[in-house]
UniProtKB/Swiss-Prot annotation:
Entry protein name: ABSCISIC ACID-INSENSITIVE 5-like protein 4
Family that this chain belongs to: Belongs to the bZIP family. ABI5 subfamily.
Subcellular location, record wording: Nucleus
Subunit structure: DNA-binding heterodimer. Interacts with ABI3 and the AFP proteins AFP1, AFP2, AFP3 and AFP4.
Molecular function GO terms recorded: DNA binding; DNA-binding transcription factor activity
Record function comment: Binds to the ABA-responsive element (ABRE). Could participate in abscisic acid-regulated gene expression.
Organism field: Arabidopsis thaliana
Gene3D superfamilies attached to this UniProt entry: 1.20.5.170
Region (Leucine-zipper): 339-360
Phylogenetic lineage: Eukaryota, Viridiplantae, Streptophyta, Embryophyta, Tracheophyta
Start and end residues of each bZIP domain: 311-374
Amino acid sequence: MGTHIDINNLGGDTSRGNESKPLARQSSLYSLTFDELQSTLGEPGKDFGSMNMDELLKNIWTAEDTQAFMTTTSSVAAPGPSGFVPGGNGLQRQGSLTLPRTLSQKTVDEVWKYLNSKEGSNGNTGTDALERQQTLGEMTLEDFLLRAGVVKEDNTQQNENSSSGFYANNGAAGLEFGFGQPNQNSISFNGNNSSMIMNQAPGLGLKVGGTMQQQQQPHQQQLQQPHQRLPPTIFPKQANVTFAAPVNMVNRGLFETSADGPANSNMGGAGGTVTATSPGTSSAENNTWSSPVPYVFGRGRRSNTGLEKVVERRQKRMIKNRESAARSRARKQAYTLELEAEIESLKLVNQDLQKKQAEIMKTHNSELKEFSKQPPLLAKRQCLRRTLTGPW
């Protein structure tokens, strides 16, 4: 059991992809005609021509996934042929493929008629006239999707040149994970010697078996292939960055991620140290891990919005209480002043009344004294008068 680096696909070599293209096309669903698809994948009573484009693509993806799963299952038991990469030129997945709204709602027959009418309106002759005579059942799925504009030729070429698949170039049964673009990372498990193959893009260092191995793309390959379009740089030049545990955590140690041990063990874990190298660094400098400088992320300032709101509410409540108390004191003071003024007025009225009463009592007493000094008047005695009323 050993670990080695496979750099066959780092330079973007398209010769191997072109060699595996016929085999890949023979095993792909997109090389089948609609009649063959109907006889192979079609359901009874349901024609592919009556399906919408969305439904057609969903059925193709389902069949492709099923084929890939069956191929993977069979590849574990028996090694595949040399250079066989099933699903290498597969269609883009639903997450990256968007159909036009007008095209997704049309059926396959309507799209086929529209393509024929469009070619007829352009006035093409010669070989195009022979192609227009071709029926939908004789048309391959790949040609139909290309003419409909669902699959671009650039995408198909990139998929054909991709090295991702379920069989490595050495013909051993295994499992390989790739990105679908040349010059990118791919990890494969070889079935013969149980080794791990890591196809890594230049510019990213890997720690394999406790050592750092750097893959650099030679400049001669770029000069030999000037006509090939270079893919965009996925891993730019980066500096060493170290992530350390926060200060408040109980475990304050740094965790490093390594890929030590056999290839069939669990690959890595949660790590706290991330190190990236640039294409300009030499392999001698990357033989061992450089001691990282820990960069501690602080907790940052906590949000005090809740506390500020509580303090603001208390201040507003205190201001309201003070204003209410001032208003109540003003009302009490005004009421007290009114009462005092009323008392003063009542006192004045009482004094006037007391003076009048004293004068009246004085005059009454003087009159009584004068009356008592006068002699009493004697009344005349009244006698009974004799009357002659009797008979005598």
